[in-house]
Amino acid sequence: MSKLSIVKVRTDKDVNSFVLLAGGEAAVIDPGEPAAKLVGQLDKSKLRYILITHGHPGHLAGKDALKAATAAETGMHVADAKAFLRSADIYLKDGDELELGGFQLRVIHTPGHTPGSLCFLLGNHLFTGDTLLAGSLGKQAPETDVRQQLYNVLSKLLVLPLNTAVYPGHGSATSLEAEVRTNPYLRPR
């Protein structure tokens, strides 16, 4: 199996964008601006996917420029495409899998922060956008509430191994184990 590299790129609006490199292929999760910072991290790999965790501007501001530079396919959930008047080449849903350089990238739908919030699981690496942050949850969409988001985190994310690394859309990386121990939203009341 090929080697996996994960590069965190801090983009405008304090958004964490991630470049995943495996077997000569790449994916970008949450392409902020400037897109040139992301292109510079591709290291001769072919960009296959531009993946959006949710439709807020900072998390996809570089999508169109990155697509123009690379012709990669864009993917997001249809609920956020409709809610934020966005478009994508692929409308992703819970359980979808994308192949990337010999690895399987699994899509996990976690509505709460936005109706179409997605997380992406690659091996034991979980990219959570604003669904789960270190020590917190992302602010909920007006049409949802913290209980729905918390239910999705508990039922879809905390069933993963506790040693799963978590890469949120803002702030520092963490792990599911650390979040179970320290995140006040995840502790029993």
Predicted segment positions?
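Active-site HxH/HxHxD metal-binding segment of metal-dependent hydrolases
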Residues: D12, A26, E33-Q104, L137, ...
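Short secondary-structure boundary segments
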Residues: P31, H54, V78-A79, L122, ...
